[in-house]
A protein has these predicted regions:
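Terminal (and in a subset, N-terminal) low-complexity or junction segments at the ends
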Residues: 1-150
Length: 150
């Protein structure tokens, strides 16, 4: 739908996510490559992606919706909630929960990777998207994957 809107010249809101770390709110746009820590963020995302593949977990390229809307590079590291979550992990203390607010719906690919990250780092990650509240803990989401099953 968003692709068709762009093709028809309609304005499409960019995906944006916000995370608070140490009292400061940080904003990330989809495909944000201008953040001062973007190399560190992308490096950690790449490590998570490799661990997912090794563990046989459904990775970012598996989501049909994402394949239609973005290149593999965008799918892998361009979604704003992934950037915000990893920024939060890098810049907060061990065991601290991560809270992210996103202006759009969280895609299946992001949902899968955040479940994996929450289990891998043993941290609670909460994401409020345009549709619902997701609380990830130990690789399980409070939404019980409703709407994300294949």
């Amino acid at each position: 739908v968003r692709k068709m809107m762009r093709q028809n010249g309609l304005i499409v809101d960019p995906g944006c996510s916000w995370v608070e770390v140490k009292g400061t709110v940080h904003a990330f746009l989809r495909g944000d490559n201008f953040h001062p820590q973007i190399k560190e963020i992308n490096a950690l995302l790449e490590r998570f992606y490799k661990k997912m593949k090794e563990a046989g977990v459904e990775g970012p390229e598996s989501s049909h919706m994402d394949i239609m809307e973005a290149s593999k590079a965008d799918i892998f590291c361009g979604h704003s909630e992934r950037l915000a979550i990893v920024f939060g992990l890098i810049n907060s203390g061990p065991g601290m929960p991560i809270w992210v607010i996103k202006n759009l719906y969280m895609c299946q690919s992001c949902h899968n990777i955040v479940k994996f990250i929450s289990r891998e780092v043993r941290r609670e990650i909460s994401v409020r998207d345009a549709e619902q509240f997701h609380h990830f803990k130990g690789g399980i989401c409070s939404c019980m994957d409703e709407g994300y099953r294949s």
